[in-house]
Design a protein with these regions (language model features):
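Structural marker of alpha-solenoid helical repeat scaffolds
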Residues: 13, 47, 64, 81-85
Length: 104
């Protein structure tokens, strides 16, 4: 929780950035707070729509909250972002997660 507190203080001091929001989202996800993770990860991708790692984690957090349609959208946008940066591994991982979500 110390990392979360430090990151929240940075955010409160006006140091908002995609990396800070991704870091907060990641820490909240690790702490089991998917709802707070989603909040920060959505901010991360708003600040940097090409941030494929944030899209991937956002998709996972949304899926964890059973918000499957939103997770599909996050993975789809994340795949496009990853492919735009030539990040084939991230695109491949998100394609696998998307395929799992689409299973009946």
């Amino acid at each position: 929780m110390a990392l979360i507190e430090n990151f929240e203080k940075m955010l409160a001091s006006g140091k908002d950035s995609a990396l800070l929001r991704f870091s907060l989202g990641n820490e909240y996800a690790k702490a089991g707070d998917a709802a707070r993770a989603v909040e920060h990860l959505q901010a991360a991708v708003r600040l940097d729509p090409g941030y494929s790692a944030a899209w991937k984690l956002l998709g996972k957090a949304l899926a964890g909250l059973s918000r499957d349609e939103e997770a599909r959208q996050a993975y789809t946008q994340g795949i496009a972002a990853a492919e735009g940066h030539g990040d084939k591994q991230a695109a491949k991982e998100m394609a696998v997660f998307l395929k799992r979500l689409n299973r009946p």
